[in-house]
Amino acid sequence: MNKITNNVTIWIKPKTVEKKWYVIDAADRVLGKVAVDVVRILRGKHKAYYTPHQDLGDNVIVINASKVRLTGKKYQQKLYYRHSRYPGGLYSDTFRTLSERKPCAPLEIAIKGMLPKGPLGRGLFRNLKVFSGSEHTLKAQNPVKLEANLER
């Protein structure tokens, strides 16, 4: 406690925070801009008591992930790499082939790359649910549709 101002730092515990559910529609929006807004909510940066080393963020449902948009020639040229962990087992997919095989994967990969690495990031990624269509199975959570700050 500071003797001059009598300020005390308040530490919020993750168990005491009530997590809300938000729905974000990714249709006809740029992949990176949607991912930035999703990560901001997952990390809790929109809250006044944001702490970087704790999971104080909210849960996010992303719908229409298969209709996300890319700029330039990235639809044909952007590459995603994976490895089978065997010698010579490096595989690459373009955005087009990956989105045909797994429609939600490009958005999930973009979001996962923006989250912190380690146990905190894995826990935050579990708060994300991505659906390729316009319907989701989490209506019981009463999610709030989020429209703000998605188009810059």
Swiss-Prot record:
Keywords: Ribonucleoprotein, Ribosomal protein. GO terms for molecular function: mRNA binding; structural constituent of ribosome. GO terms for biological process: negative regulation of translation; translation. The keyword Ribonucleoprotein applies. This protein is one of the early assembly proteins of the 50S ribosomal subunit, although it is not seen to bind rRNA by itself. It is important during the early stages of 50S assembly. Part of the 50S ribosomal subunit. Belongs to the universal ribosomal protein uL13 family. This is Large ribosomal subunit protein uL13. The gene is rplM.
